[in-house]
C-alpha cells in the first residue's frame, strides 16, 4: 500500500493484481490441503460417532426386548459414547492449534535469536561530554566484501560548529556520518566525542545525543502528534506544538481535519515531501540533541519547499555540532568548514 502511487503512476494495477491473485492462490492451495485433511477427519469422526450410536441403539433395543437390559442402562451407554468421543475431538483440535502455534513461534524465534552486530562493550559508560569536539582519527572502513570505502580519514569538528561534506555520489559521505552513531563500526582508526572513544560509550547514550534528518523521511502509520513525539516519547503536548512551530509546520497541521491527531497514512503517504521533512525536523527539535547530522535533507525538494526547510534546518543547527551532506551550494553556504570527499 505504501507504494500505491508508484503503481498508479506506471499504470501497473493489472500487474499488481495478478501478483496478488497468484499469492492468494498459493495460500489457498496450502490451506485447501489442510482443510481437506481436517474435513476428512471430522466427517470420519462424525460417521464413527453416529455408527456407535446406531449400534448401541440397535443392540440395546434387542437386549431390552429380551429383558436383559433396562432403558436406563441403554441411556447410560449412549451418554458414554459422547464422553468417549469428546476427548478425541478436543485432542485433534488441540494438535492442530499446537502445529499452527509452533510454526508461528519458530518464525518469531528465528527473528528474536538474531544477534545484533554492534553491541555495547563490557565496560561501556554513558557519554561524558556530548557537546565536545568530534574527531575522526585515521579512520578507515570497509564492508564485509573488503572493498575499502574510507581510507585514513582525519578531521575534527569543533563543538557547536558546522561542517559540510561534499563530493560525488558513492564517495562515502553518508558512510562517514553513519559511523558516528555506530550504525557501522570502523575497520581501523578512532572516533571520539569530547575525547571519549565512541566504542566506550553505551549505544543508547551515544545515539540519544545525535539527531539525524535524512533525505528519505520515514513516518509511522499514526497521527502527526505521535510521529513528532517519537523524538521524545515523554514530551508534553505543549512541547510537541513548540517543536512543530520551530520546524515551521504548526500552521499547516492546524489546517488538517483533526489537527495534531490527523492520521498521516503509512509512511506519511497523505503528506507532501516538504511536509514530511518538516515533521521529521520537528521530531529532532523535540529530541534536542547536541549533535546533528543532515543527510541531503533537501535534495529531493523543489526550490520553494527547500527555502522553507532550509530556514527550519538553520534554526535546528544553531548552537549544535552539525554535519551536513549536500550537493546544493545553498544548503552549505552557512557551514563553518567544507570538506570534499573524493
Question: What kind of region is each of these model predictions?
Answer:
Residues 7, 108, 242-244:
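Helix-loop junctions and hydrophobic alpha-helical segments within the transmembrane domains
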Residues 20, 108, 136-138:
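Conserved catalytic Walker-motif region of ABC-type ATPase nucleotide-binding domains
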Residues 5-54, 93, 97-100, 116-117, ...:
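An intracellular "coupling" helix at the cytosolic face of ABC transporter transmembrane type-1 domains
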Residues 120-121, 127-342:
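ABC-type nucleotide-binding domain
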Residues 2, 6-9, 22, 29, ...:
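Regular, well-ordered alpha-helical segments
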Residues 37-107, 111-112:
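Helix-loop-helix
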Residues 12, 69, 86, 103, ...:
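Short, conserved catalytic or interaction motifs in soluble domains
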Residues 1-19, 110-127, 142-144, 249-253, ...:
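Short intracellular "coupling" helices and adjacent cytoplasmic loop segments at the cytosolic face
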Amino acid at each position: 500500500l505504501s507504494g500505491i502511487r508508484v503503481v498508479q503512476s506506471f499504470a501497473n494495477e493489472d500487474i499488481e493484481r495478478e501478483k496478488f491473485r497468484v499469492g492468494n492462490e498459493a495460500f489457498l492451495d496450502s490451506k485447501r490441503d489442510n482443510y481437506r485433511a481436517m474435513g476428512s477427519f471430522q466427517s470420519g469422526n462424525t460417521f464413527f460417532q453416529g455408527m456407535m450410536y446406531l449400534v448401541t441403539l440397535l443392540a440395546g433395543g434387542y437386549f431390552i426386548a429380551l429383558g436383559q437390559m433396562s432403558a436406563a442402562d441403554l441411556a447410560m451407554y449412549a451418554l458414554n459414547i459422547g464422553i468417549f468421543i469428546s476427548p478425541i475431538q478436543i485432542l485433534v483440535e488441540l494438535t492442530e492449534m499446537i502445529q499452527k502455534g509452533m510454526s508461528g513461534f519458530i518464525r518469531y524465534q528465528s527473528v528474536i535469536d538474531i544477534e545484533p552486530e554492534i553491541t555495547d562493550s563490557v565496560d561501556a559508560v554513558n557519554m561524558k561530554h556530548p557537546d565536545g569536539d568530534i574527531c575522526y582519527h585515521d579512520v578507515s572502513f570497509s564492508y564485509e566484501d573488503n572493498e575499502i570505502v574510507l581510507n585514513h580519514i582525519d578531521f575534527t569538528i569543533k563543538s557547536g560548529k558546522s561542517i559540510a561534506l561534499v563530493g560525488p555520489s558513492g564517495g562515502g559521505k553518508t558512510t562517514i556520518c553513519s559511523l558516528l552513531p555506530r550504525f557501522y563500526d570502523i575497520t581501523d582508526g578512532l572516533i571520539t566525542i569530547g575525547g571519549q572513544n565512541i566504542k566506550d560509550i553505551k549505544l543508547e547514550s551515544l545515539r540519544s545525543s545525535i539527531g539525524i534528518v535524512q533525505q528519505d523521511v520515514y513516518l509511522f502509520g499514526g497521527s502527526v502528534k505521535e510521529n513528532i513525539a517519537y523524538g521524545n516519547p515523554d514530551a508534553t503536548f505543549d512541547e510537541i506544538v513548540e517543536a512543530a512551530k520551530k520546524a515551521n509546520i504548526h500552521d499547516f497541521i492546524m489546517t488538517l481535519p483533526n489537527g495534531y491527531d490527523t492520521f498521516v497514512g503509512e509512511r506519511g503517504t497523505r503528506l507532501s515531501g516538504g511536509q514530511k521533512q518538516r515533521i521529521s525536523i520537528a521530531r529532532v527539535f523535540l529530541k534536542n540533541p547536541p549533535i546533528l547530522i543532515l543527510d541531503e535533507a533537501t535534495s529531493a525538494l523543489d526550490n520553494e519547499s527547500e527555502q522553507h526547510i532550509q530556514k527550519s534546518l538553520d534554526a535546528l543547527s544553531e548552537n549544535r555540532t552539525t554535519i551536513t551532506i549536500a550537493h546544493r551550494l545553498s544548503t552549505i553556504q552557512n557551514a563553518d568548514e567544507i570538506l570534499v570527499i573524493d
